[in-house]
Amino acid sequence: MISYEKLWETMKNKGVSQYALIKKYGVSPGQITRMKRNESISTHTIEMFCRILDCDVGEIMEYIREE
């Protein structure tokens, strides 16, 4: 499974709130909800978060092996 838990940590470290993502950067609340639920999102959305947060993909998501 893909986990976006690292996203919330990176946002905190960079001082970017969910409110800022929505209001300043135009991220839809639905995208944020999908990431909170670890649901699938597009590569475009992943790229957008990397640009906004000035980070690498590994700083916002990780693969967790399900057993």
What are these regions (language model features)?
Residues 38-51:
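Short, basic-rich loop-to-helix N-cap that marks the start of a DNA-contacting helix
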Residues 27-41:
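Recognition helix of helix-turn-helix/homeodomain-like DNA-binding domains
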Residues 54-67:
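Short C-terminal boundary/hinge segments that cap the last helix of small helical domains
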